Amino acid sequence: MRYLKNFLVENLGDMTFAEAQKASGLHINIAVAPYNASQNPLILNALTAPNALVWSAVMASCAVPVLFPPVHLTSKRYDGQHTPYMSNTKWVDGSMRSDFPQEKMARLYNINYTIASQVNPHIVPFMQSDTE
C-alpha cells in the first residue's frame, strides 16, 4: 500500500475534494464502504466530505479485500495538517456494499437520469444483460 499511496500523492497532490472542485470545476465522487458492516457506505465529494483528501479516498476505493487491505481516510485541517477522517473506521471499495449509489447521487445533485460505465471486471458475472 505504501507504493500506491506514494503514487497517488505524487499524481493527485494534497488536494481535498473541495479544493479539487474549486480548481477543476468538476464534481469528483468516490464511493467507499466501511470494513465494519454496521455502518453505511459513503459517497465522498465536495458536498459530503469537503476536507477529505482525494488520494485517501482513491486508496479506499482500491481496497478490495484479498488484494489490498482496508484503509483509514485522511482529511486536511484549515492549517494544512493531516488528520484522520472518522478515525475509528477503516474503508474499502464501495462496490463491496454499494457499487453505484444512484439514489444518493440523485438526491445530492438533483438529477433524474444517470449514465454510468462499469469498469470493474470482478462485477461482470453479476451483471444482467438487457437482451436476455
Describe the residue ranges of each PLM region.
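Patatin-like phospholipase
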Residues: 1-132
